[in-house]
């Protein structure tokens, strides 16, 4: 991001370093050291600083770190050699309408398995939602709401963002599940809501039946930032 006074800043790179380390452990990949990750962020941003969108544009420089196996392995087993790479690109609003409220449908497809890899930032989790998001767009929806795969009664997340709900008494509620990706944006928003805005916050199981009783709903994530939901 570019700040009002012209500085270039990154959003919580330390927590992103911790999350990629956790994901590596879950996928049997050697952990990317935090110092290496943070150095890469600084070098990539510095090399592409001319592409950081100006303050007030609503756009950002999106940074994508990734790790993948590179040696030839036929069997179902971890690779022996991996590469850690990082690239960046300027991006505008995640949804085409910008801050315009989006429309979401409840999906009949599962994004992740119970006690599986849903809490790991792995490419396979996004692959699981590709056909479903294309189908949603073809039917006039912006995103899918995924329910828990075990009982299909509780709200989890979308294919690329976490949910935030606000009750009629002003409490900020976010779903809790072991198959939801731990969102750094969501975590930060909950701290801001509680510590700086004085709001009551709850991270708990959210049943789909109670969604109709919330006063507000939104999505949050690295790309989505904060996107209002107008209809489910």
What is the predicted function of each stretch?
Residues 145, 150-177, 182:
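Glycine- and Gly-Pro-enriched alpha-helical subdomains that act as flexible
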């Amino acid at each position: 991001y570019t700040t009002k006074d012209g500085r270039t800043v990154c959003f919580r790179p330390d927590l992103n370093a911790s999350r990629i380390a956790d994901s590596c452990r879950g996928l049997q990949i050697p952990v990317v050291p935090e110092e290496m990750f943070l150095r890469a962020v600084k070098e990539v941003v510095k090399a592409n600083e001319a592409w950081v969108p100006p303050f007030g544009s609503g756009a950002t420089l999106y940074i994508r770190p990734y790790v993948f196996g590179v040696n030839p392995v036929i069997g179902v087993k971890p690779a022996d050699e991996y590469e850690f790479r990082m690239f960046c690109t300027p991006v505008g609003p995640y949804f085409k309408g910008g801050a315009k409220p989006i429309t979401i449908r409840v999906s009949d497809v599962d994004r992740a398995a119970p006690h599986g890899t849903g809490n790991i930032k792995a490419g396979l989790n996004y692959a699981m939602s590709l056909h479903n998001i294309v189908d949603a767009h073809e039917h006039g929806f912006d995103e899918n709401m995924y329910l828990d795969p075990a009982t299909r009664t509780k709200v989890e997340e979308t294919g690329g963002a976490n949910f935030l709900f606000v009750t009629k008494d002003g409490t900020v509620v976010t779903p809790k599940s072991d198959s939801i990706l731990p969102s750094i944006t969501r975590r930060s928003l909950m701290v801001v809501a509680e510590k700086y805005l004085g709001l009551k916050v709850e991270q708990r199981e959210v049943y789909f039946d109670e969604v109709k009783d919330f006063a507000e709903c939104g999505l949050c994530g690295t790309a989505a930032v904060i996107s209002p939901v107008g209809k489910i």
